[in-house]
Amino acid sequence: MSLPDAAIDGRLLESARRHFLEKGFLNAQLKDICDDADVTTGALYKRYRGKEELFDALVADTLREIEESISQRAGIDLHTVSDQALAGAWANTYDGVMEWFSFCNAHRDGFVLLVRCAAGTRYGNFLHDFCAHMTEIDYQWLVEM
């Protein structure tokens, strides 16, 4: 029995990333992704159940990093924070905004895939869902204050 070619994974993901960024999820074709990666569709289906699972693989790291970042910020015990620190948390400081921009830039392709290219996937409402999630976190934070 032959061993799976690990190089195929990287080629498939890179090809899928290019096609999804260029055409969006709905217009990207698995045949084109496979042709550009120089693999058969059978090789793709040995690794992924379909196009959406391939898309999931591309955005998984970005989603995980977003959740980790949110968890770190939301996990602060408000009873141990000074009034000055609480007031500062509401200020959109230059450093805070630049930190968020740097985060987005470091995960640029993942964000573009989620915000602009995800129609037809379970992430099709990512921007709305993300804003609603952040609003709920802020609301809970206010309730606890």
For each feature predicted by the language model, list its residue ranges.
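N-terminal intrinsically disordered/low-complexity leader segments
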Residues: M1-D5, L78
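Helix-turn-helix
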Residues: R11, S15, H19-E53, A57
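Short, basic, alpha-helical segments at the C-terminal edge of helix-turn-helix-like DNA-binding modules
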Residues: L30, A60-E67, S71
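Alpha-helical DNA-contacting segments of helix-turn-helix folds
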Residues: D56-T62, F126
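Hydrophobic alpha-helical connector segments
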Residues: A57, S71-N105
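Amphipathic alpha-helical packing segments from all-alpha helical-bundle domains
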Residues: A91, D95-A106, G120-M145
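Short, hydrophobic secondary-structure boundary micro-motifs
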Residues: V112-V115
